[in-house]
UniProtKB/Swiss-Prot annotation:
Gene, per the UniProt record: murD
Catalytic activity: UDP-N-acetyl-alpha-D-muramoyl-L-alanine + D-glutamate + ATP = UDP-N-acetyl-alpha-D-muramoyl-L-alanyl-D-glutamate + ADP + phosphate + H(+)
GO annotation terms (biological process): cell division; cell wall organization; peptidoglycan biosynthetic process; regulation of cell shape
Lineage, uppermost ranks: Bacteria, Pseudomonadati, Pseudomonadota, Gammaproteobacteria, Oceanospirillales
Pathway(s) it belongs to: Cell wall biogenesis; peptidoglycan biosynthesis
Protein name: UDP-N-acetylmuramoylalanine--D-glutamate ligase
Function: Cell wall formation. Catalyzes the addition of glutamate to the nucleotide precursor UDP-N-acetylmuramoyl-L-alanine (UMA).
Length: 446
């Protein structure tokens, strides 16, 4: 921040959680700033007034003159860089995001996690591992607390989840270690193609000292770097120096090379995709120098996150799992591939919603292999049905109540009812949390 001239304002774009965090940060440090939001009446106006009642505010548009005169433009992740008013000043004024500012100000090492799926789980798990080792850790980013709110002198380690939107405006994160857990089609309503999404995700590695890479997902791997160390993780047998899975007579083990670390049956989070998440977390913890045994104990105790392959109930021999956070095809693929092999019966899958321009056909093989019945909801239900229903019974439901009741009717003891929509929720629900909460409500009412 010392590089900024105090006689020129920062232009903060967006009055959501990130913009309000930026406003609070600048106010506490005595910097002048203005705020703009393309919405006429953004919900954050009252909170901004409480933070700083004197700040200039423009709503309903971006003010071109104020943008051109700004020292920097701090852009919220919900506003695309392609906005015409931002393109008009690109090259004249530095455009960055809160993560870029955070990376300049953080005085402790950063572990950065991104990917299409699993990033909140891994971020939270690494945070729990650090706490188990007695480290003063700050955890946040895309999953909760904005990164600027994490900054504190006493913090010894930052563990942050980052979205592709946040990374678009991050020039050089400089993380101690970073990972792209996996990559599958998502946000195609924002990106021109999969390559643009891929390149945004790979920005997490800029200036990174150790890259934690998924050996099983070529899309999640950057070009090999001479500057960064590399640690690999895989669901296959690991090579020396890699994290992976050993299939032994007594079951599957998480392993580091030939060293067995933890039997997967001791983990409380379900599914093979969570084996991969656990391995990535262990690799990141290793990069931060955390002691292994407290990390393994934290892994044993970790129960997972709400709305992410969350166990809800067992009813009449049928397990009900809430994976409402699965808002893209890759997340639902991971849930099916992870839960299918450990389910004695079939899976009754509730899916659908707003597809965000995704191609649903990559989900078809997993549906064919593991799903006995499809219950389809939401505005892109017809597209899902067309892409997935070949050879599988497909039924439509107008509400979550109807979907849960249909799923209960079509399931038998040993089956698993899985809400894993592969879509956004806003056509029928307030958000994915509301969708998951309604699922749990109607399951418990059965």
């Amino acid at each position: 921040m010392s590089i900024l001239a105090r006689d020129r304002n920062i232009a903060v774009i967006g009055l959501g959680k990130t913009g309000l965090s930026c406003a609070d940060y600048l106010t506490r440090r005595g910097y002048g700033f203005c705020v703009m939001d393309t919405r006429e009446n953004p919900s954050g106006l009252a909170e901004l007034n409480a933070i700083n009642p004197d700040v200039p505010v423009v709503t309903g548009k971006l003010d071109q003159d104020m943008l051109a005169r700004a020292a920097e433009i701090w852009l919220s992740p919900g506003v695309p860089l392609s906005h015409p008013d931002l393109q008009a000043v690109k090259g004249q004024v530095k455009i960055c995001g809160d993560v870029d500012v955070f990376s300049r100000e953080a005085n402790a090492p950063i572990l950065a996690i991104t990917g299409s799926n699993g990033k909140s789980t891994v971020t939270t798990l690494v945070g729990e591992m650090a706490k188990a080792c007695g480290v003063n850790v700050a955890v946040g980013g895309n999953l909760g607390t904005p990164v600027l709110d994490l900054l504190a002198d006493e913090v010894e380690l930052y563990v942050v989840e980052l979205s592709s939107f946040q990374l678009e405006t991050t020039d050089r994160l400089g993380a101690l270690a970073a990972t792209v857990l996996n990559l599958s089609e998502d946000h195609m309503d924002r990106y021109a193609d999969m390559m643009a999404y891929h390149l945004a995700k790979l920005r997490v590695f800029y200036g990174c000292r150790r890259q934690v890479l998924n050996r099983d997902d070529a899309l999640a791997q950057p070009p090999l770097s001479r500057e960064a160390e590399i640690t690999w993780f895989t669901l296959k047998t690991p090579e020396p120096g890699q994290y992976g899975v050993l299939e032994e007579k007594d079951g599957a083990w998480l392993a580091y090379g030939a060293e067995k670390l933890l039997p997967v049956e001791q983990m409380r989070i379900r599914g093979k995709h969570n084996w991969s998440n656990a391995l990535a977390a262990l690799a990141l913890a290793d990069a931060a120098g955390l002691e292994r045994e407290p990390c393994l104990q934290a892994l044993r105790e970790f129960t997972g996150l709400t709305h992410r392959c969350e166990w809800v109930a067992d009813k009449d021999g049928v397990a009900y799992i809430n994976d409402s956070k699965a808002t893209n095809v890759g997340a639902t693929q991971a849930a099916l591939a992870g839960l299918g092999p450990v389910t004695s019966g079939g899976i009754v899958l509730i899916c659908g919603g707003q597809g965000k321009g995704q191609d649903f056909t990559p989900l078809a093989p997993a549906v064919k292999e593991w799903v006995s019945t499809l219950i389809i909801i939401g505005e892109d239900g017809p597209k899902l049905k067309e892409a997935l229903a070949g050879g599988v019974m497909a039924l439509s439901a107008e509400t979550m109540e109807e979907a849960v009741k249909l799923a209960a009717e079509k399931s038998s003891p040993g089956d698993l009812v899985l809400l894993s929509p592969a879509c956004a929720s806003f056509d029928m629900f307030k958000n994915y949390e509301d969708r998951g909460d309604q699922f749990k409500q109607w399951v418990r009412a059965l």
